[in-house]
Amino acid sequence: MLGIIIDSISTFMYSKLLVILLIGAGIYFTIRTKLPQMRLFKDACKAVVEKPEDENGVSSFQALMVSTASRVGTGNIIGVSSAICIGGFGSVFWMWVIAIIGSASALIESTLAQIYKKKGKDGECYGGPAYYIEAALHCRPLAIVFCISMIATYAFGFNMLASYNLQSTFSEFSFYDTKWTPWIIGGILALITGWCLLGGGSRIVKVTSTLVPAMGVAYILIAVIVMIINHAYLPVVFSKIISEAFDFQAIFGAFAGSAMMQGIRRGLYSNEAGIGSAPNASASAQVSHPIKQGLVQMLSVFIDTLLLCTATAMMCLSSGIAPAQELQGAPWVQAALHESLGNFGPLFITVAMVLFAFTTLLGNCFYCDNLLNYIHKGQPSKGFMKGFRIVSSLVVFIGAGMEVSMLWNISDVLMGVMALINIPVILILSNTALKALADYEKQKKNGGNPVFRARDIGLEYETDYWG
């Protein structure tokens, strides 16, 4: 009964509210920022490698890796597989649409996070939707509601789902026992996650900045190899992606399973553009201008969906193994790669899932640390944080043995609540970000390295960093 209720809420949110909100906001921001996805792509690449003035500060690259660690997760494999198996080839197109227009939303929200970030008692930068909701809208209760919804989404919903997706990958191996193996794998993952979490935020940044680039490069390399092997199928694959994306039945028929709805659901789950998660990481970066980190987070959306999600889609669709609802998730991906690469294929996917899930768990918990700092108006006690991290690790263990459809629906609903709070807020505050963008481009045009001062855009709010 509970599962039916949650599924109904999820279907309503993604068939009506979030379709209008996500696509509408993305188009609005794309127009107002004059197509930054193309116009400022070069600037985004340059901003990634910029060094912070303080040697001990978090660089743009490190902030990108933390946000990408959360974005690049099991959704890039299992989420894409599920979307295609349920919604068909056209789901891929709608994932691309959400990524391209959603990246403009990512630019706005991360710029706002930089402008309104605060300096903690420990000297670190803290920011995100909660901070700009309180500072600009003077509504701390709404900010706390957002924090609670995000903690529920990431520490519980997403982390349980990542744990389940990881253990399900092993179901293709002969040693897998449906009664015991999920709990054994969940226990091992929980122990490793707990060890890393108890090392604090600095260890999270260090681990993710090492794992994410290697993981992404290896995954794309394998995808390219598979596409070369199956190159004869690619024209047909692209043709079906486009034709099914605009098929009336695929868009409107049985909407819960339509290409559009599945593309939006899994695209949002994968790249997180506009839901308010990445700003918590982007605020920690030390940059000379807020727009630089906004551009970096725009690039992170491209990395996630246009590279990694597309890699999964092309690997599977070009294999000749037809997608089917009973194969959704790991089984279809493993079958597709086995067809192209033999026994190496399922083994590679298993390794990729382990790395993707692990970096997802760490990135998610980094966000929760930031949120707890906000709720407590400073660093919570060591005892509280230790207890929270132990509970977070236990959640990872529990998720491994839960029922998958319930986990997907819970995650979708919780993520939708975040979007329903954050997107209207960034629409209201977008003029501040747009003024910052104009200031950035004016300084670039004059030939200098853009340096932001709040008073230059008429911002009366007394910031901690941009006086």
Predicted feature locations:
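Transmembrane helix-loop junctions in multi-pass membrane proteins
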Residues: 2, 18, 33-37, 75-80, ...
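Extracellular/periplasmic helix-exit of transmembrane alpha-helices
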Residues: 30, 108-117, 224-240, 254, ...
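Flexible loop linkers connecting adjacent transmembrane helices
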Residues: 35-60, 82, 88-91, 104-137, ...
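Alpha-helical membrane segments and immediately flanking helix-loop junctions
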Residues: 54-86, 112-130, 134, 151, ...
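Selective recognition of specific alpha-helical transmembrane segments in multi-pass small-molecule
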Residues: 101-109, 187-201, 212-232, 265-266, ...
